[in-house]
Amino acid sequence: MKLTTVTNVSVDGVTQGHRRIDAGPRHETDAPDEDGSGTFERFGWAPPLLDDAASTFISQTFQRADAFLFGRRTYEIFAGSWGAGMDPGNPVGEALNTRPKYVASTTLTDPRWADTTVLSGDVAGAIGELRAKPGGELQVWGSGTLIRWLLDRRLVDEIVLLTYPVVVGQGTRLFPATGPDLGLDLVDLLSTPKGLTIQTYRTTGRPQYEAATA
């Protein structure tokens, strides 16, 4: 399966707190799990900028997934929002409740959401086995710490960025100040009436650099 990450990000690269629901209790922070809120205060910067075009893209992206991969904190947020009792006619809820879900976590032992498998121990090996399966798409939503962990191990095939026209000015960013370098090919670019840009990139290994002059 192709491993695709889908991330809501501000112009200054912040991923943290894009919805108010993210202002929950702090959970484990050890990679490959998701980070907590810390001292971040500027929650909910994304919903005012969502429009019908962005919502349609999000729904269609969820529907094309064959399976989902989460860090623990994002998994628990999604389970609380989209788990039992969700309107079966909701396309996002339908996708999440009918596809297999995988959680990269060293502490989660009793997942309550149906069709969930916890990946512990050799997480990279388990994800590699999922990627080796023919066809399909394994999607990672949110889960910023997990995404950085995956990028560091070059386990990501495509990166989708929903970039919101806002500078948040604080918070955890998708790409750290120091991390792996990565070449990208732009395979799709969309814009919405409220100014979101949605970029889809295919990873190409390490980037090329200008040769040093004599």
Q: For the regions a protein language model found, what residue spans apply to each?
A:
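Portal/gating segments that form or line small-molecule/metal binding sites
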Residues: 1-155, 165-214
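Conserved catalytic/dimer-interface elements of ABC ATPase nucleotide-binding domains
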Residues: 160
